[in-house]
């Protein structure tokens, strides 16, 4: 009887820990500041959106988002993205670059299930409110 109760209690505790623990990949979603990497950027085939203001790219191998500010106007730029894959929770987020044009390429590494789809837009970004504005274009890629 005591062994059964101890075993049941242990199983319940393990289930509770698993239920309350968020996955590492989803915990990093939301609004993220891109890292300055300098040097060469992504494979040009990965770049789905570009204009005078910024360039946005997604490399499916390794799941890297790349963002480059192309205008020295001091205004941050962002990638607004969505991930979908049947059988898995949808995810979304914003990656912003407030380092300026002189920083060159910036990036953020994500982790997605294979065979999903990434859709993304290029946007202006307001750092104090953590909000996007004037988004345009639609890039997409498979994971």
Language model features: what each stretch is:
Residues 1-27:
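Secretory targeting and sorting signals
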Residues 27-143:
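Post-signal peptide N-terminal regions of Sec-secreted extracellular proteins
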């Amino acid at each position: 009887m005591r062994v059964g109760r101890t075993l049941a209690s242990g199983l319940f505790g393990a289930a509770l820990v698993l239920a309350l623990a968020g996955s590492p990949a989803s915990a990093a979603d939301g609004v993220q500041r891109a890292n300055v990497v300098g040097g060469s950027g992504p494979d040009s085939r990965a770049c789905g959106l570009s204009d005078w203001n910024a360039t946005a790219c997604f490399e499916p191998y390794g799941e890297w988002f790349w963002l480059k500010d192309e205008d020295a106007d001091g205004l941050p730029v962002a990638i607004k993205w969505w991930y979908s894959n049947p059988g898995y929770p949808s995810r979304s987020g914003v990656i912003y670059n407030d380092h300026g044009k002189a920083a060159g390429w910036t990036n953020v590494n994500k982790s997605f299930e294979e065979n999903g789809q990434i859709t993304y837009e290029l946007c202006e970004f307001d750092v104090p409110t953590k909000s996007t504005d004037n988004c345009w274009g639609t890039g997409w890629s498979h994971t």
